Amino acid sequence: MLGEINPDKSMEKKEYKTELKRLENELGSLQLRLRSVGLPVVIVFEGWGASGKGTHISRLVNPLDPRYFDVRTTGKLNEEKQMRPFLWSYWTYLPPKGQIVIMDKSWHRLILPGIREHWGLSNMEIHGFYYDVNAFERQLYDAGYLIIKLFLHISKDEQASRFKALAKEATTAWRLNERDLKQNEDYEHNLRQFEKLLRLTSTEENPWHVIEANDKRYASVKIMKTISERIKERLKEIENPKPPVKIQASATVLEKTLSKVHPDETISDEEYRLQLGFYQERMKMLGNKMFAKRRSAVIVYEGWDAAGKGGNIKRLTSEVDPRCYAVVPIGPPRPQEHSRHYLWRFMVKMPKDGHLTIFDRSWYGRVLVERIENLTPPHIWQRAYREINEMEQHLVTHGVVILKFWLHIDKDEQLRRFEDRKKDPSKAHKITEEDWRNREKWDEYEEAVDELLFRTHTSHAPWIIVESNHKKYARIKVLQTVTDALDDAMR
C-alpha cells in the first residue's frame, strides 16, 4: 500500500493559493451544514515522525469557527492514561453532535512500529488491539459519527532532512528523541509495519486516506480536499437516508431464566450479623489490596424497581476506603450525554487502576427501558448486545474485574414494597408514577431481562442473579460473590 505510493507529489505556489482559498471557503460552509444536521466528525492524523501533522492541523482549522471544534494532543501516555483501558481517553475526546474533534495522533498508537516494542506487547496483545480499534470505529460509525483517518506519508530522505532541520534549532531540537531517529534508521521495516496497520484497520466505512506529504503545499490541499469530500458524502447520506438494516432475529430459543429462579432464599438474623461483619471486613482488606496491586473493578447493579439496590450497595461499600471507590447512579441521559455515543457517559466513569466503580443501573438500560418504552429503534438496541460485549471485553483485557448483578424479586414482593413506601413518609419519595407504569409491563421486562442474560453473560463479565425477596440474604450473597471474585483476581 505505502510502498506503491510516491510521496513526492508537489504543487506550484500559484495553484496552491487558489485551491487553498477555495477549500477554506468550502470547509467553513460545510462546518455550518454539519452543525445544522448534528453530524459529529472525528479527524485523525497519523503518520511518520516529522511528517507535518502540527503544521497541517494549523492550516486546516484556520477557516473553522473555533467554538465548534477541538484539537486534542493524544500522543504521550501519561500516568492517567496508563491507568485506564487504552481506548478510554479517546472515548473522553468524542465530540457532541454537530462538532469536530481533531486528533494529532490516533488510537492506533500502541500498535505503531517502535511504540509496541517499547511497551513489550505480545503478538496476542497486538491482535487484541486490532480487534478493539476496529470495534471502536465500527461502533462510532453505526452511531452516526464520521471518522476521517489521514496517514501522512514521507520518504526516508525527506524524514532525515526534516530531522536534521529540527536538530539544528534549539527551539525545535527537544521534539526529537531516540525513537524518532530509530524510525528513520529502520525505515523499510517500519514501512512494512505501517502497511500492515493500514491494511488491518482500513474498512469500507472507516478507510485510511494516505496523504503524500513530502511537499507541504500538496499535502495541505489533499488533506482539505479529502475532508471536504468525506463530509459532503456523509451529508448527502443524511439528507437521503436509506432504511435501516434489519437485524435478523436469532433462531435460538431463548432460555426463560428468571422464571426458574425462586427469590425466597433467606438467612437468619444471627447468621446475617456474623456474615455481614466478616464479609465487610474482607471487602475492606480487598479494597486496600486492589489499590496496592493496581487492580480495578466494575460492579453493575440492575434489578426490578424496589429490589433493594441502594441498601445492597451501602452494605457492600460501608467499610471500604471512600477514596478508592465511586458509586455512579444512572438516570435518563442529560443533553451533553444524549449528544454523544450512548456508551460515552459510562466509559468516562470507568475506574482507574486500583479503584472500584459501582453503577446503580448501567448501559443495560439500552436493552431494557429504552427497548420497552420504545425510546430507541429496534435496529439500534439490537446491535447494543454486541457493542456491550465488546466494551466489557476491552475493560477485561486491561485487567478490570467485572461483576453484574440482577436483583430479583417476585411481583407480589414488589407490590408489598411499593405499598410500604407509599404509606411511609420517609420513603414516599422512592415511589413514582413511573415505577407503577413499569410494573404494568412486568412480562415485557422479564422477556427483555432473559434476553440480556442470554446475550451478555460471559465468563469474563458474568451475570449473577441475586434472590432478593429477603434483603439480608441478597446483601450477603453480593458481598460473598464480590469478595470471592476480587480475591481470585489478585492471587
Regions found by a protein language model. Give the residues of each.
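Glycine-rich phosphate-binding loop of ATP-dependent small-molecule kinases
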Residues: 1-491
